[in-house]
């Protein structure tokens, strides 16, 4: 009886196997793309209110460290983010801390500095020789900062910038701003009356929401006027205040003076990494504020209109593709425990070629920030101040010398008496 198998005999199987091997060897296997550089921009964790309001029964003393300080909840949020980053970049970053691979910069504010510390504790728990005390699963890792008054990279809005101030004045005359002011005029007045604030505007009301939000989060009682409807309106106005800062009117012009400054630095860092000029640096982290993320995302035109939550993180990943070209992928992590969601630059795919990424962002990059900000008429450099001081001293010396010379010259009497007898008139001489 004939065998019904279609596999054939042994020699035939060997021939088929050989053909399969030859076929796959002729088609090169795709190489995996390589992650080359990562930039993180994250907001600090949960904090106490930045300000109170006059009628608030919960004064600053109820917060263990006072206003604007990171809480234990915020510390845990950033430790969690550090753990998530450790898992995400396993195989890219060294398992243990390597100072050549990572650089962290923070604004010079307690809550951002402490958030960076908590983040690094989660990212790099000490291992082996890095353990200096077996009872402490932590190691010191440097965080760099500069004074707030000098920070023109992470502290927004950047000032002084007269051109930006002018744009904000124009924004207040925009239809959207006027409409919001008209719509919420009575509401803002009610909030002012209830809080005891003398001035409550679209630009300042965010602080009222912030205080109530922090108190609610930490289980403090809220005033009876702070109903769900009131909180909802305050939340909406708070979100508008962020858009007002960097959008609403002339978004691109504002970006050139604000968020574009940070974008420009991020692009320079990625370009250096693509050109193997980053000296082994793999990850650069910026610890900052919701206003930093707002300025950044509105400059990129990817802002979702909502205030960035605590410990949220905007991620830039630079990849080297099989072709040798580089691409940039962005992600936004805005919820703990959730995978960061992809963010695409308008006009480009999610994996955006680096050259296209740079080209699309050129309109928001200032060629000469000080000139565009018109700071030359506003800020005097140290050299200018020294020059003016020397000039003033020289002028003073010249005036003193001239006065002394004038005093030493012979003087004519201002009045002369006529000695004619019988004439008692005093004749006044001319003072020449």
UniProtKB/Swiss-Prot annotation:
It is a single-pass membrane protein. Keywords: Disulfide bond, Glycoprotein, Hydrolase, Lysosome, Membrane, Signal, Transmembrane, Transmembrane helix. PROSITE patterns: HIS_ACID_PHOSPHAT_1, HIS_ACID_PHOSPHAT_2. The chain crosses the membrane at residues 385-405. The active site is at residues 44, 290. Disulfide bonds join 161-373, 214-313, 348-352. Gene3D superfamilies: Phosphoglycerate mutase-like. It is found in: Lysosome membrane; Lysosome lumen. Residues 1-32 form the signal peptide. One of its GO terms (biological process) is lysosome organization. One of its GO terms (molecular function) is acid phosphatase activity. Its EC number is 3.1.3.2. It catalyses: a phosphate monoester + H2O = an alcohol + phosphate. Glycans are attached at residues 94, 135, 179, 193, 269, 325, 334. One of its GO terms (cellular component) is lysosomal membrane. InterPro entries: Acid_Pase_AS (IPR033379), His_Pase_clade-2 (IPR000560), His_PPase_superfam (IPR029033), Histidine_acid_phosphatase (IPR050645). It holds the Pfam family His_Phos_2. SUPFAM superfamilies: Phosphoglycerate mutase-like. Residues 33-384 are lumenal. The membrane-bound form is converted to the soluble form by sequential proteolytic processing. First, the C-terminal cytoplasmic tail is removed. Cleavage by a lysosomal protease releases the soluble form in the lysosome lumen. Residues 406-432 are cytoplasmic. Belongs to the histidine acid phosphatase family. This is Lysosomal acid phosphatase. The gene is acp2.
């Amino acid at each position: 009886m004939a065998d019904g198998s279609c596999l054939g005999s042994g020699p035939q199987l060997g021939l088929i196997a050989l053909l399969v091997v030859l076929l796959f060897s002729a088609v090169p296997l795709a190489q995996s793309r390589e992650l080359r550089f990562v930039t993180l921009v994250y907001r600090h964790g949960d904090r106490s209110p930045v300000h109170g309001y006059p009628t608030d029964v919960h004064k600053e003393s109820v917060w263990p460290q006072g206003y604007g300080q990171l809480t234990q909840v915020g510390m845990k949020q950033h430790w969690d983010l550090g753990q998530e980053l450790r898992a995400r970049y396993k195989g890219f970053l060294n398992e243990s801390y390597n100072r050549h691979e990572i650089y962290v910069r923070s604004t010079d504010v307690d809550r951002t500095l402490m958030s960076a510390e908590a983040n690094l504790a989660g990212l790099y728990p000490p291992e082996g020789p890095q353990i200096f005390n077996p009872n402490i699963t932590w190691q010191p890792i440097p965080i760099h900062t500069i004074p707030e008054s000098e920070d023109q990279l992470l502290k927004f809005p950047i000032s002084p910038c007269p051109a930006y101030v002018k744009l904000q004045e124009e924004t207040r005359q925009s239809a959207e701003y006027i409409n919001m002011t008209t719509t919420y005029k009575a509401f803002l007045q009610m909030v002012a009356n209830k809080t005891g604030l003398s001035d409550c505007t679209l630009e300042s009301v965010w602080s009222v929401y912030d205080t109530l939000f922090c108190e609610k989060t930490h289980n403090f009682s809220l005033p009876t006027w702070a109903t769900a409807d009131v909180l909802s309106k305050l939340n909406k106005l708070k979100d508008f205040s962020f858009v007002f800062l960097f959008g609403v009117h002339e978004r691109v012009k504002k970006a050139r003076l604000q968020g574009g400054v940070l974008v420009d630095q991020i692009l320079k860092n990625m370009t250096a990494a693509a050109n193997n000029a980053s000296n082994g640096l793999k990850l650069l982290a910026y610890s900052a504020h919701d206003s930093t993320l707002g300025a950044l995302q509105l400059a990129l035109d990817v802002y979702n209109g909502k205030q960035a939550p605590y410990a949220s993180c905007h991620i830039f990943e630079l990849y080297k593709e099989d072709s040798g070209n580089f691409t940039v992928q962005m992600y936004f992590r805005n919820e703990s425990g959730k995978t960061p969601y992809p963010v695409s630059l308008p006009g480009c795919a999610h994996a955006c070629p680096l050259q296209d990424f740079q080209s699309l962002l050129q309109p928001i990059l200032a060629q000469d920030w000080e000139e565009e900000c018109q700071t030359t008429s506003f800020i005097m450099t140290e050299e200018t101040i020294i020059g003016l001081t020397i000039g003033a001293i020289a002028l003073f010396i010249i005036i003193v010398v001239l006065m002394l010379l004038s005093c030493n010259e012979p003087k004519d009497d201002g009045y002369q008496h006529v000695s004619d007898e019988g004439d008692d008139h005093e004749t006044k001489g001319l003072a020449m």
